[in-house]
């Protein structure tokens, strides 16, 4: 199983993956989680889905339906933690660097069986780290639920958490960062028996712009 990587400008190379990804995000964040965020016609997107610098990672099933996805924006561009919830940093200096990116909108189809759900999450996380490290990105910052932060710890990523969770709307969130170095992702490979590259590292003019 391989993970696709694309930007809005290169999404046409992957069939209907971009639209299918937006539908999955709507299913997870709007329908299931109840977030009040921009959406239309069963698709979710926001101001951080930018054609020039947002990168996407998706896993499609045999019917070309996206079952897992994640989003990455370098922190030298506008990103969620800095723009929307800087208080989650608890005084830590927020990065503004091409060597640090924010991972967001990571989700897996909730209708997948538990084992497949866990594997898809691990594989998508690993793909993002692999691509980032190959492109000079050394850390991911994130905003997530406390339970998801514990899941990152269980994956062996050893996240640095900036401070206690803060209630935003009806739920609590926290922020932190973790390394994208290959040594950080080794536990994921060991636990799930993943060997070799999980994503094709290639360059296209549209992809290297950001």
Give a label for each model feature.
Residues 63-93:
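Short, His- and charge-rich active-site/binding loops that engage polyanionic ligands
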Residues 52-54, 67, 96-101:
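Short connector loops at helix/strand junctions that flank enzyme active sites
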Residues 102-105, 170-210:
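Charge-rich, low-complexity intrinsically disordered segments
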Residues 80, 86-173, 177-182:
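Acyl-donor binding region in acyl/amide transferases
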Residues 1-47, 51, 56-63:
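Short amphipathic alpha-helix that is part of the acyltransferase structural core
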């Amino acid at each position: 199983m391989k993970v696709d990587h694309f930007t809005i400008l290169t999404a046409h190379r992957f069939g209907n993956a971009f639209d299918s990804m937006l539908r999955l995000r709507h299913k997870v964040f709007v329908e299931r989680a109840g977030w009040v965020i921009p959406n239309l016609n069963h698709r979710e997107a926001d101001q951080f889905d930018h054609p020039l610098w947002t990168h996407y990672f998706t896993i499609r099933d045999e019917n070309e339906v996206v079952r897992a996805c994640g989003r990455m924006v370098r922190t030298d561009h506008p990103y969620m933690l800095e723009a929307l919830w800087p208080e989650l940093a608890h005084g830590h200096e927020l990065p503004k660097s091409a060597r640090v990116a924010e991972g967001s909108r990571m989700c897996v189809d909730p209708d997948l069986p538990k084992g497949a759900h866990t594997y898809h999450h691990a594989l998508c996380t690993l793909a993002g780290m692999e691509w980032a490290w190959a492109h000079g990105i050394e850390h991911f910052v994130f905003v997530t639920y406390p339970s998801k932060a514990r899941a990152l710890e269980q994956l062996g990523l050893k996240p640095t958490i900036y401070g206690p969770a803060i209630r935003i709307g009806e739920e609590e969130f926290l922020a932190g960062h973790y390394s994208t170095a290959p040594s950080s992702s080794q536990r994921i490979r060991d636990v799930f028996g993943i060997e070799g590259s999980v994503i094709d590292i290639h360059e296209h003019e549209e992809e290297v712009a950001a």
